């Protein structure tokens, strides 16, 4: 086993606990970013390109007939063999958390429709379910079993929000274990059936699941109701005759106590369990090798990797399976440093030789790691954009000239600035306020001095006023500079001078009226 540190060259902030990695014929793709996708990559799926220990995230391309795939963290994912050649390998995605902290109950199917040396084009379709539809959840597992030439999805575990009649303002985001029901999902006809097995008494989440032919093994997990990580090992076997499916569960010895572990396949019959937690605040540093032979499962400890001091002393870690016996791990950065990364990333190779594609069986584990604060609202929204331009990466030149630093630049300047002392617009919490907003906040230009941009919402502008100002050519001054602008532009009020009309200058004045006494005096004076 070898451990290598990985340097992320761009979009580091997108990689957060709960992401998933999908391996399509040796090419790895990242799914489940933090926040809503931005316009530079509206699909939210990135090519996970690692070369010489440097990771580069490149935007993936979807066909125009694809449905919208929101960024989902802590979903259940598994591979599925389609019937046609174009659907040779598919990924099934169910559940998960959106950036708005909502839980999804939808099923998405991702497949490759075009592949060349430059890029891979995906198609995403949404499947509707009827029957016993599983409730929205996260931290669960989804596997595909094959029996008698048929296939069926097996869904189990996870967490969901409290029922609506029990949710209060103080505990609105409180979660609980889902009922320990096993769901069989027919992806071809969109039917789901729920089964109650007496061996499964408590709900589990963040467990490990391994599918082999007609059998699914459930290992470990965390029970939120009892706050324990039972060392249980269940074997769920599914028989698919012409009639109704038959399902049974057996409790096996030899389980281990672990939650949020990552499972990777090293060869046709062996898997490696990496990471996870054995207590709430204690990571599980031991790795295990799982062997499957003749419908038997054996779990043994294996050589422990040479963990770095940063990994040993970190309180949490997270990651996902890269396929071919490799695991991608992340730990929080050192906040004590003046300039530090938010996360440090590593790649653990559990085998020296890559697994050949023909030897790879389509198995899955619940590889999303557990968030220490998953009972609280732990994620906020980012910029959201989805339009026809999401599928407009038609030319190779345009794909190659993608600005990889656009995500970081936009978060520091442009629409996400602090426009005034009372500005509360945050890239992580912003939601549209005006009807004209879609993927960024509305802004207006202040003409004071050299000019600067301010958010319309921070200026308390009504939508009608905002539209009027945007259509006209009038100058606008923000709340901070409006008084200064008035003092500079509005003259002081002065009393206007009253000028007599010109006609009055030529008008003959009225004669004076003399009293009889004055007339008598003047008469005597001149006499």
Swiss-Prot record:
**Where's it mainly located?**
nucleus
UniProt GO MF annotations: chromatin binding; histone H3K4me3 reader activity; phosphatidylinositol binding; phosphatidylinositol-3,4,5-trisphosphate binding; phosphatidylinositol-3,4-bisphosphate binding; phosphatidylinositol-3,5-bisphosphate binding; phosphatidylinositol-4,5-bisphosphate binding; sequence-specific DNA binding
Q: Name one GO biological process term.
A: B cell lineage commitment
* Spans traversing the lipid bilayer: none
Describe, by residue range, where the zinc fingers (PHD-type) fall in the chain. Answer: 416-484
Q: Where is this region: Disordered?
A: 359-380
Query: InterPro entries attached here?
Result: Gal_Oxase/kelch_b-propeller, Kelch-typ_b-propeller, RAG2, RAG2_PHD, Znf_FYVE_PHD
Task: Please give the GO cellular component terms listed in this UniProt entry.
Answer: DNA recombinase complex; nucleus
**Which stretches does UniProt call biased (Polar residues)?**
361-370
Where is it expressed, tissue-wise? Thymus.
Compartments where found? Nucleus
Q: Which residues bind Zn(2+) 1?
A: 419, 423, 455, 458
Indicate which residues the UniProt annotation says bind Zn(2+) 2. Answer: 446, 452, 478, 481
Bias (Acidic residues) occurs at: 371-380
**Keyword Zinc-finger attributed:** yes
Query: Any idea which UniProt keywords this protein has?
Result: Chromatin regulator, DNA recombination, Metal-binding, Nucleus, Zinc, Zinc-finger
* Family of the protein in this entry: Belongs to the RAG2 family.
The subunit structure is:
Component of the RAG complex composed of core components RAG1 and RAG2, and associated component HMGB1 or HMGB2.
**UniProt free text on domains:** The atypical PHD-type zinc finger recognizes and binds histone H3 trimethylated on 'Lys-4' (H3K4me3). The presence Tyr-445 instead of a carboxylate in classical PHD-type zinc fingers results in an enhanced binding to H3K4me3 in presence of dimethylated on 'Arg-2' (H3R2me2) rather than inhibited.
Q: What is this protein called?
A: V(D)J recombination-activating protein 2
Q: Which organism is this entry from? A: Oryctolagus cuniculus
The opening ranks of the lineage are: Eukaryota, Metazoa, Chordata, Craniata, Vertebrata
